[in-house]
């Protein structure tokens, strides 16, 4: 709830329903607890995000509209904690490692999408990164202007790439004019 501020091992133990001593059965020290807990939490957030990701090309536009708000509501506090942890110089290398994995997983997802929507994964991957960045920024700061600006560029990009690669799956009905 409060990120790292005012959160000690006693509060963490209470939240986990155990004693402080029990925490150290699983973690060598507080740093390991923070690093491992953050990585686990964010892996669950990413799993939720990818579970909502479209598998049917016709769902892409709906996904672009709905997911930023869902992400903010469901995961905003978790994103703020992650950034608080991973931007500390002490944990920066762990953040870099986490995001390297994110890059690999989203690139793999883009490769899986390529045959379904007819756009090369090398084009899809940066679009995913822009989308995720916009979602995370909105989840952390609820900056509607930034979100809408990013979403408009993404939607236009998707339509342009669909036209370029002659894919009819994602075009809205009124975009065919």
Feature roles, as predicted:
Residues 1-32, 36:
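Helix-turn-helix
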Residues 8, 79-82, 94-97, 148, ...:
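Short, hydrophobic secondary-structure boundary micro-motifs
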Residues 9, 38-46:
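Short, basic, alpha-helical segments at the C-terminal edge of helix-turn-helix-like DNA-binding modules
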Residues 27, 83-90:
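Short helix-capping/turn signature of helix-turn-helix
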Residues 36, 49-74, 125-128, 151, ...:
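Hydrophobic alpha-helical connector segments
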Residues 45-46, 50, 74-77, 90-118, ...:
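Amphipathic alpha-helical packing segments from all-alpha helical-bundle domains
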Residues 67-68, 82-86, 128-135:
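Short alpha-helical scaffolding segments that buttress acidic/His motifs in well-ordered protein cores
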Residues 100, 113-161, 165-177:
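Hydrophobic/aromatic-rich alpha-helical bundle segments in the mid-to-C-terminal region
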